[in-house]
Amino acid sequence: AADTYPTEDGRVVPANRFEKYLDALLLSSTNQGGTYDDQKRHYLINVHGAGNDLDASYDSGGEMFIRTYWAGYRGNFVQFSWNGDQGSPFFANNVENAFQTSPALLVFLRDNLHVLRGATVADIDLLSHSLGNQVALDAIRLHQVALPGTSLLHNITCIEAAIWGETF
């Protein structure tokens, strides 16, 4: 079932939960559903940290949406989920998952937002928490390798980054 959220002008926008990224891409690209308000141009992407399964990702994304909404954000909010719940003491598995997921985030930003939705670099900001920073920063790195000197997004805010200094 689709969740909905009201907009300040009285409209109600669907916010569907997709079990797989491909399902979201296919539905949004064929206009059979989707999670975007096409009347808004800005996108805020939230990448959760380690220790989140799919349900916890929805919860943390909902919490972040509420906080950004009450702070004044009124654009499109997208929760990007990844497999970061391998559990302690196996943090290395989560790190491996973060690196394996970063290409999917790159594809989502580049192909879904830039190509299908027509978003510009100025239209996309990203929040990432904990090991989600590795997912986000590696996606940016992969973009720079493919297209040196170009930007993928406008701003990234790294919250409690669980990455090591040698990363940079």
Feature locations, PLM:
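Alpha/beta-hydrolase fold nucleophile elbow
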Residues: R117-S130
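Gly/Ala-rich beta-loop-alpha elbow adjacent to hydrolase catalytic centers
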Residues: L105, S128-G132, A136
